[in-house]
């Protein structure tokens, strides 16, 4: 299965109505044309992939290697550069533009972004644990509790207070509601990770849902 992908910016959420009057909450992703900066092949690089650049960056903020890399594609330095593997290399050439019309309404996609950061939080907020008794006699209210009858160290992965959010998350099997080529906008059903104006990666679903028996 070949993969399609594009880089974009999360704008926010809104809602659209179908012809039947059904309300659908959607996330608006602005995806201005991405530029193909490099086409990697098995012979030269050991794997097949394309490298896309998104969002122009001032030359004064880029070094010489960055400027030389994008000069091969006859474009300006890019703020974000990502690779997409398992693509059909014959469909891409260096300096080509990838637009939102690479997707169509009804396509199933995976969306990757960095979640909002919430700073240092306790167990109740961070992991959804329960409080202790709040009566006057109790001395246990919002503490983590016992770590168990284990050796004198903390095992990795235990739920303890710490930093919450600001992690890369992928939400799978979201549906493209509309691809607006004129405005360079994708409408994706549901919510996607990240704050408004943050970078998101939209690509073909890795494990799309199986069709139901009635749809076969």
UniProtKB/Swiss-Prot annotation:
The keyword Calcium does not apply. Pfam families: Ribosomal_L3. One of its GO terms (cellular component) is cytosolic large ribosomal subunit. InterPro entries: Ribosomal_uL3 (IPR000597), Ribosomal_uL3_bac/org-type (IPR019927), Transl_B-barrel_sf (IPR009000). One of its GO terms (biological process) is translation. One of its GO terms (molecular function) is rRNA binding. The keyword Metal-binding does not apply. This is Large ribosomal subunit protein uL3. It comes from Levilactobacillus brevis (strain ATCC 367 / BCRC 12310 / CIP 105137 / JCM 1170 / LMG 11437 / NCIMB 947 / NCTC 947).
């Amino acid at each position: 299965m070949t993969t399609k992908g594009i880089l974009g910016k999360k704008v926010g959420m809104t809602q659209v109505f179908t012809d039947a009057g059904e309300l659908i909450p959607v996330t608006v992703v602005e995806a201005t044309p991405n530029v193909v900066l490099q086409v990697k092949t098995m012979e030269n690089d050991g794997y097949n992939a394309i490298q896309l650049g998104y969002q122009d960056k001032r030359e004064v903020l880029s070094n010489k290697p960055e400027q030389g890399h994008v000069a091969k594609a006859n474009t300006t330095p890019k703020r974000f550069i990502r690779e997409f593997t398992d693509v059909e290399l014959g469909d891409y050439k260096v300096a080509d533009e990838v637009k939102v019309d690479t997707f169509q309404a009804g396509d199933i996609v995976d969306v990757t972004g960095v979640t909002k950061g919430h700073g240092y939080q306790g167990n109740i907020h961070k992991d959804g644990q329960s409080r202790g008794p709040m009566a006057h006699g109790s001395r246990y209210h919002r503490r983590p509790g016992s770590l168990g009858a284990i050796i004198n160290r903390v095992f990795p992965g235990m739920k303890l207070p710490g930093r919450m959010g600001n992690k890369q998350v992928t939400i799978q099997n979201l549906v493209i509601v509309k691809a607006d080529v004129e405005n360079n906008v994708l409408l994706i059903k549901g919510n996607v990770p990240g704050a408004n104006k943050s970078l998101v990666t939209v690509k073909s679903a890795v494990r799309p849902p199986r069709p139901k028996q009635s749809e076969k």
